Amino acid sequence: FDFSLNQTVVPPTIGSYDPISEVYTTLDTLTNSRFASDMIIEGDFVYVAADNILYKYDINTMNIVTTQNISGIRNLAVWNDKIAVSRGDYDNTTFAPILFNSYLQFYNTSDLSFYSELDTITGPKWSTQNMIVENDNLYITINNAFEFGNEKGIVGVVDMTSMSYINEIDLGPDGKNPDNLLIRGNKLYTVNNKDGSGASISEIDL
């Protein structure tokens, strides 16, 4: 996607790579999307977040099972029969952040129908990105990444059994704009883009 021209030059694709034969195969071309931001595999299905669309594929045939339009979709995480969707985006004309009523939504994995959401009163107040589920808790990065100069550094915690927002962890001034999440043992790690001039890693005890 060419931001200066505001048009797709080469559409995103989904592919597979065989490390033995060293052959890459294109499985699908997402012609209606500017970019793809996440892909996860759960059981017999592949879920893809691409621009403003959530795709569900059959992993054996890579045929599309169903899709759901979701403005600002970013990253995905599955818990039981629900798929969590983080959200955030910017206006192509003004480059200002798009303000959503909710930056964290939940959909049914069976048909991708809407299930529920946490709005900006009961959940994250700014744009969100990566997520990890551990012991029925959903950890989600809150970075406000699309409001340049006002990045946040927070990890939100959702109790998935009640789908309630139970905690926020402040990453401090050097932990702004968390982009990625990893878990190893009883530690949670965030990779932070800060203001774009550098990066940092935060470690959180779970």
Residue positions per predicted region:
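Acidic/polar, low-complexity intrinsically disordered N-terminal segments immediately downstream
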Residues: 1-55, 87-88
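A short beta-strand motif characteristic of beta-propeller blades
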Residues: 22-32, 61-69, 113-121, 164-171
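A short loop-to-beta-strand structural motif that recurs across blades of beta-propeller domains
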Residues: 12-15, 53-55, 102-105, 153-156, ...
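Asp-box/WD-like beta-propeller blade repeats and closely related beta-sheet repeat scaffolds
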Residues: 65-105, 109-132
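Repeated scaffold domains used in trafficking and secretory/extracellular systems
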Residues: 33-43, 71-81, 123-134, 173-185
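Short loop/turn segments that connect beta-strands within beta-propeller blades
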Residues: 18-22, 58-62, 108-112, 159-163, ...
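Short, solvent-exposed loop/turn segments at conserved positions within beta-propeller repeat blades
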Residues: 5-10, 49, 91-102, 146-153, ...
